[in-house]
Swiss-Prot record:
Gene: ptsI
The species this protein was found in: Chlamydia pneumoniae (Chlamydophila pneumoniae)
Keywords: Cytoplasm, Kinase, Magnesium, Metal-binding, Phosphotransferase system, Sugar transport, Transferase, Transport
Amino-acid positions noted as binding phosphoenolpyruvate in the UniProt annotation, renumbered to this chain: 306, 342, 452-453, 463
The protein's name in its UniProt record: Phosphoenolpyruvate-protein phosphotransferase
NCBIfam families documented for this protein: PTS_I_fam (TIGR01417)
Cross-referenced PANTHER family: PHOSPHOENOLPYRUVATE-PROTEIN PHOSPHOTRANSFERASE
Entry's transmembrane regions: none
Disulphide bonds in the chain: none
Assembly behavior: Homodimer.
Length: 571
């Protein structure tokens, strides 16, 4: 189609990648993305101390911004990970070495604060960018970039438009979106996001998904520039097909919404065979999440409680009493199966407040800090007096790690009265765990496959990186076969398996999980009803057929083609 002739009031469609699925309608709004203009100025000696004062003032205002935003997101369901990111921003801004370098450079070179700060942060960004292949490097680069823009914005009195102040339905277009921007968005009016680049496992996507805001990314620059001419016009995000539809016709709107409407209308008419459809459970990460789930979905189990978020919310490690109080609520939760409590999952991009250790993560981090692990196990032992709990060990790469944790548990539980059953499970997130699954299974009562990390470590990418075009699919063939391998072994050992991560809530993959025999899908609370309704529309034979085809796929493009074709058949 000739894009030039499409500009005006005619309907125009462009393709992107659906990062967060769903439908969204609103006016196009391009968020200001022009880089802040930083001039280099040489100051008279008598103005140097005033310039340093100006820097401190901008830095303190930036800290206040982050503290205010953190307080805002702390109480919101599903946004604890954002709080962790904001804590990392604060830690960087509080770093005395950073402040010392900026202040000393202003004094020594007599340059203006914004120029010096921009130069210092630029060097840090360059050093991080040079380290290729390390997980989460892109996350850190984005953090540095975000902090730099915030401080320089205060110095230059320039700021992006606030996403919390809109009073009309908008689809936000931005070359690059940060998690803090998405977290601050007023979801009553910000209906969708579109960016030049983006990945389904990025922090930005996780926040957008938690807020149930559809998100489309990876638009070509040529089409992006043409889309700017539609600023203020109506646009529809079709997150199921990965399309942007500018000036949608009434017939298009009716057709696009038909899928979601039909889900509600036909839920009671078609059911997957009993015992063959997966249980849908919910993520949680705070006391408020548990209360919200109890209020809205009292019979829904907690499929993944991220215990480290308690430390993030408090800004410190929780006391034994604080842990016991929270874990007792999990033990008493009236879901249809016991709550799953993941042990502290610190390290790398999720630092523990007050402890700097970036060498290890997950269970290896915990074993390095055995006192912290033993305190958590004591809290679990006390909470088990109130009810059954499932304990999930994160980031296992070798069976010896499971054995060591369980040995500590055996010692600790003898100090307390015998409580209800405590089951033990393992997160399958690393390829090493997949290929040692036969050795891991005898130590486990259940398994949980973390698709985000499994994809990341299998393909050798970071969470924030946009996948190369030939790999741009939520589950590449290698990971599909890994999941199949784990499920086959688990079935032989009669060990149930759940899926958590971005893939669990992606409706196009639900037939695959049913066909593979997944027993549980753990998703964010806003996705629960949509996923259950979708499952109710699926036929078992069709699920088995698409699963067989996907297991034979050799490339990501084949996977995408099969999923798109199946999506059209079932829609």
């Amino acid at each position: 189609m000739d894009t030039q002739s499409s500009i005006g009031n005619e309907e125009w469609r462009i393709a992107g990648t659906s990062v967060v699925s769903g439908m969204a309608l609103g006016k196009v709004f391009f968020l200001g993305t022009s880089p802040l203009h930083v001039r280099e100025l040489t100051l008279p000696q008598e103005e140097v101390e005033h310039e340093i004062h100006r820097y401190y003032k901008a830095l303190n205002r930036s800290k206040s911004d982050i503290v205010a935003l953190e307080q805002e997101v702390t109480g919101q369901q599903g946004l604890q990970e954002v709080s962790s990111i904001l804590q990392a921003h604060l830690e960087i801004m509080k770093d005395p070495l950073l402040t010392e370098e900026v202040v000393n450079t202003i004094r020594k070179d007599r340059k203006n604060a914004e120029y010096v700060f921009s130069s210092v942060m630029g060097k840090i960004e360059e050093s991080l960018t040079a380290v290729r292949g390390m997980p989460s490097v892109v996350d850190r680069v984005q953090d540095i970039h975000d902090i730099s823009n915030r401080v320089i914005g205060h110095l230059c009195c320039q700021h992006k438009s606030s996403l919390g102040e809109s009073d009309q339905n908008l689809i936000i277009f931005s070359e690059e979106l940060t998690p803090s921007e998405v977290a601050s968005a007023n979801s009553a009016y910000i209906r969708g996001f579109v960016s030049l680049v983006g990945a389904a496992t990025s922090h930005t996507a996780i926040v957008s998904r938690a807020k149930s805001i559809p998100y489309l990314a990876n638009i070509s620059e040529e089409l992006w520039n043409i889309a700017k001419r539609y600023n203020g016009k109506l646009v529809l995000i079709d997150g199921y097909r990965g399309e942007l539809i500018f000036n949608p016709k009434p017939a298009t709107l009716q057709s696009c919404y038909k899928k979601e409407l039909s889900v509600v209308a036909h839920t009671s008419q078609r059911l997957v065979r009993k015992s063959l459809h997966p249980i849908v459970s919910s993520h949680a990460g705070s006391d408020k999440d548990v209360e919200d789930l109890l209020e809205n979905f009292p019979q829904t189990s907690i499929g993944l409680f991220r215990s480290e978020f308690l430390a993030v919310i408090l800004g410190r490690l929780p006391t034994l009493r604080e842990q016991v109080d929270l874990y007792e609520k999990l033990a008493r939760f009236p879901g249809d199966s016991p709550s799953v409590l993941r042990l502290f999952d610190f390290g790398e991009d999720k630092p523990c407040p007050g402890i700097k250790n970036k060498k290890e993560r997950s269970i290896r981090w915990l074993l390095d800090y055995s006192v912290i692990l033993e305190d958590q196990l004591q809290a679990i032992a006390k909470a088990s007096l109130q009810g059954s709990i499932k304990v999930l060990i994160p980031g296992v790469s070798d069976v010896s790690e499971i054995i060591e944790v369980k040995k500590k548990w055996e010692t600790i539980q003898t100090r307390f009265p015998k409580g209800h059953k405590v089951s033990w499970g393992t997160m399958i997130e690393f390829p090493s765990a997949v290929w040692m699954i036969e050795e891991i299974l005898p130590e486990c009562d259940f398994l949980s496959i973390g698709t985000n990390d499994l994809v990341q470590y299998t393909l050798g990418i970071s969470r924030e990186s946009a996948l190369p075009k030939h790999l741009n699919v939520t589950l590449p063939p290698a990971v599909i076969r890994m999941i199949h391998h784990v499920l086959q072994a688990a079935k032989q050992n009669q060990v149930p398996v759940s899926i958590c991560g971005e893939a669990a809530g992606q409706l196009s993959l639900t037939p695959l999980f049913i066909g593979l025999g997944v027993q549980e899908l753990s998703v964010a609370m806003p996705v629960i009803n949509r996923l259950r309704n979708h499952i109710a529309l699926l036929e078992l034979n069709s699920c088995l057929e698409i699963t067989e085809a996907l297991l034979q796929a050799k490339t990501c493009s084949e996977v995408e083609e099969l999923l798109n074709r199946n999506n059209k058949i079932t829609s």
